[in-house]
Amino acid sequence: MANIFEVPQPGNDLLEKADQVRLASIKISQTENQNRIKALNFMADYLEKNTKEILEANSEDYKRAEKKGIPKALLSRLKLSKEKLNSGIDGVRKVGDLADPVDQVQIKRELSKGLILERKTVPIGVLGVIFESRPDAVMQISSLAIRSGNGVILKGGSEANYTNTAIVEALQQGLHESGLDKNAICLLTNRKDSMAMLNLEKYINLIIPRGSNELVKFIQENTRIPVLGHADGICHLFIDNEADLEMALAVALDSKIQYPAACNAIETLLVHRDIAPVFLKKAIPLFNSNDVKLIGDERSLELGIKHEASLSLIHISEPTRPLYISYAVFCLK
């Protein structure tokens, strides 16, 4: 493990950046709801104004990644089309439409006369987020951080450095123009700094890593900062017997084909035994017409699925109280 990942001490440049984010996070944590919404709208505006520069940066990243022979799935995540960028910009604005997550009373009860117990939501402080080569994640993470009154230190995959830099510059411009401290969002672009983040317990309040099991486990074992670990996704969808059939079909299809390369694209479909005959009768031709291959267990094969799931992929057993009759895995043809 030590040969793959090492935890260096942070250099002066990283310490300075981290301190700037920490100070900015204190200010933004005290910012009124309307001012945070205003900041998000400005951030979206500047992403639009810098669309050309962002797409050009992404084109350069993509060319370099192709030359390195990066797998197609990663290339798909790296590619930022104008449509995907516009969707991300729209997402930033929609985050502003969410209810204010700050200062919400979750629990309030009188323990005894004059003694009130109250639990309220407050900003965490500074988030350290390590993620894969998916530039649209920069917009999503940054907008959620600002909306919730937090600062954020970002480290994306090196394959997307040019794109991430262009996006963060636009977001920082928006923050500045809205009257907030642009240092609330910081991007790291080298591997050494991403590992040195683990020694920034005086500056970072929570680390959120997205990557391999090995990376997530290493981070959890080599930092004193709280870690919200994420590695393997569940990627399951369950169709209940009381589900709206048409809605279930639409959700099942969209969750697979809308962005198949995404880490949260559906891989496994579980169908309640009572609705399975009707659901699969409509689902099978729908999936086939969209180039989705279904493989399933013995009982789903009886209902029309043609390809049997390998026992090396799934373990089929008869539960004490069976809820499902279908264990079907989605995979593209």
Model-derived segments and spans:
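A glycine-rich helix N-cap at a beta->alpha junction
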Residues: 176-186
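Single conserved hydrophobic/aromatic residue that forms the stacking wall/gate
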Residues: 314-333
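A structured beta-alpha segment of the ubiquitous adenosine-cofactor-binding alpha/beta core
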Residues: 112, 116-119, 186-204
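N-terminal Rossmann-like NAD(P)+-binding subdomain of aldehyde/semialdehyde dehydrogenases
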Residues: 1-116
